[in-house]
UniProtKB/Swiss-Prot annotation:
An essential GTPase that binds both GDP and GTP, with rapid nucleotide exchange. Plays a role in 16S rRNA processing and 30S ribosomal subunit biogenesis and possibly also in cell cycle regulation and energy metabolism. The keyword Cytoplasm applies. The gene is era. The lineage of its organism: Bacteria, Bacillati, Bacillota, Clostridia, Thermoanaerobacterales. PANTHER family: GTPASE ERA, GTPASE ERA, MITOCHONDRIAL. This is GTPase Era. It is a peripheral membrane protein. Residues 202-280 form the KH type-2 domain.
């Protein structure tokens, strides 16, 4: 049996389950998950290696009209290189009708030459006939190589999807060593874990006004504890107060929850030191967008 390998980009509207699917496929938590749109800001690269070959997945930010320079960056991240990967996974929600954002995405994908697999997600919350009706509507407007019905949350249909991806990949060597599941640095993943807890614990404009920068990861001498220092950046003083909370309780809760995730990642005890700082209107300033890590890791 020939060994296959290639790159697969996951595209779709915000909050359709792209990150959940990515984590389900590789069997570990690479991308953070939240019920809020635009959780994913960078392309997240994850690797699945099996006897059949190797798939490098790229989970892109959800496609929607940008509202600021950060939004423009995220849209560019989502749409660039669509013709440079081997397969596109176009993820839609089984329980959502086609709307303006989906129409925009359909028009964009219609111009792409890369083979497209339609992935109808969240079949656990609708009747199959509804999911199939949505799929037929999309297939009438877009050339689709294969269609799969899945639940990224509980794993239904995911193994069949992976088999379908391998069928479309070319023969090739492994790009990453066996056992490696991502090529993103630890600092990036730790920052994402902290941001995930902010997404879960805060409301309104706070989640999308936040950037997290990990400044230091250092094992403590004569101890099995790793010291991690990170700064949470917001755009206004009022947001800083919300993140810190009354008597520091919100920041403490964010830190406690994030620490558990980071300890699982690093396999050791963690002392997490969190700070909150203000950078006014950073989402509209190119220099801060770059400084906060919103660039491709090459």
């Amino acid at each position: 049996m020939s060994y296959k390998s290639g790159f697969v980009s996951i595209v779709g509207r915000p909050n359709v389950g792209k990150s959940t699917l990515l984590n389900q496929v590789v069997g570990t938590k690479i991308a953070i998950m939240s019920d809020k749109p635009q959780t994913t800001r960078n392309k997240i690269r994850a690797v699945l290696t099996s006897e059949k070959g190797q798939i490098i997945f790229i989970d892109t930010p959800g496609v929607q009209k940008p509202r600021n320079k950060l939004g423009e960056f995220m849209l560019k991240q989502a749409l660039t290189s669509l013709d440079e990967v081997d397969v596109l996974l176009y993820v839609v929600e089984a329980n959502s009708p086609i709307g303006p954002q989906e129409n925009y995405l359909l028009k964009t994908l219609a111009e792409v030459k890369t083979p497209i697999i339609l992935v109808v997600n969240k079949i656990d919350v609708v009747k199959m006939i509804e999911a199939q009706t949505l799929a037929r509507q999309i297939e009438s407007r877009l050339k689709v190589a294969k269609t799969y019905y899945i639940s990224a949350l509980n794993g239904t249909g995911v193994s069949e999807l992976v088999e379908g991806i391998f069928e479309l990949l070319p023969e090739g060597p492994p790009y990453y060593p066996e056992g490696q599941v991502t090529d993103y640095p630890e600092r990036f993943i730790i920052a994402e874990y902290i941001r995930e807890q902010i997404l879960h614990l805060t409301r309104e404009e706070i989640p999308h006004s936040v950037a997290v920068v990990v400044e230091e990861i250092k094992p403590r001498e004569n101890s099995n504890t790793v010291y991690v220092s990170a700064v949470i950046y917001v755009e206004r003083e009022s947001q800083k107060g919300i993140i810190i909370g009354k008597n520091g309780q919100m920041l403490k809760e964010i830190g406690q929850r994030a620490r558990l995730e980071i300890e699982r990642l690093l396999g050791s005890n963690i002392y997490l030191d969190l700070w909150v700082k203000v950078k006014e209107d950073w989402r509209n300033k190119d220099v801060w967008i770059r400084n906060f890590g919103f660039t491709e890791f090459e």
